[in-house]
Amino acid sequence: MIYTVTFNPAIDYVVRLDAPLEIGQVNRACGEDCVLGGKGINVSGVLAQLGCPSVALGFVAGETGAWLERGLAAQGLHTDFVHLENGMTRINVKIKAGQETELNGAGPDIPDEALHQLEEKLDGLTENDVLILAGSIPASLPQDVYERLLARLDGRGVRCVVDATRDLLVNVLPYHPFLIK
């Protein structure tokens, strides 16, 4: 099985304007959409389109987390998220008015116990599985979380794929991920 991990999933609220954005003024939208995502979730979506099953893992919180989960299920994606007791899954606002302006939410705080629950889910992975760690991490997680997860799986034959930048990517290289992006 392929497992994707999105540490900070989001609902992207995309607003389109037919004129330039005017700061400090009322701007009327000519269209809007909600897009469910986060890098790992996006990978699960592409895999589903290719007919390849996967399980999307990560953290969700509050009504926005429940809404995200229902939306992914409606798209035919299988999820096994850790449900946080506090906070809400983030909402990012994307304003498309010639140029794109983004307002990205911070997302919920992820307590140590919730990270431990995710680690326990990953403990069942075997050499027949692929783990894809994708995207940024929220500030409440340790900066070495990717490295810690790969260390935890080291020697078990799980093929690990990492789609990240800067230290998140560089620090996992000693664990020889199957693929990096």
For the regions a protein language model found, what residue spans apply to each?
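Cofactor-binding loop segments of dinucleotide-utilizing enzymes, especially the Rossmann-like FAD-
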Residues: 5-9, 59-62, 84, 136, ...
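Residues at secondary-structure transition points
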Residues: 31-38, 88, 109-113, 144, ...
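Glycine-rich phosphate/adenosyl-contacting loop at the front of the ribokinase-like
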Residues: 1-57, 66-67
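A general structural detector for well-ordered alpha-helical segments in enzyme core domains, enriched
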Residues: 43, 118-121, 145, 149
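Conserved beta-alpha-beta core of the PfkB/ribokinase-like small-molecule kinase fold
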Residues: 130-181
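Short glycine-rich anion-binding loops that position phosphate/pyrophosphate groups of nucleotides
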Residues: 8-10, 98-100, 106-108, 136-139
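Conserved N-terminal subdomain of the carbohydrate kinase-like
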Residues: 23, 49-129
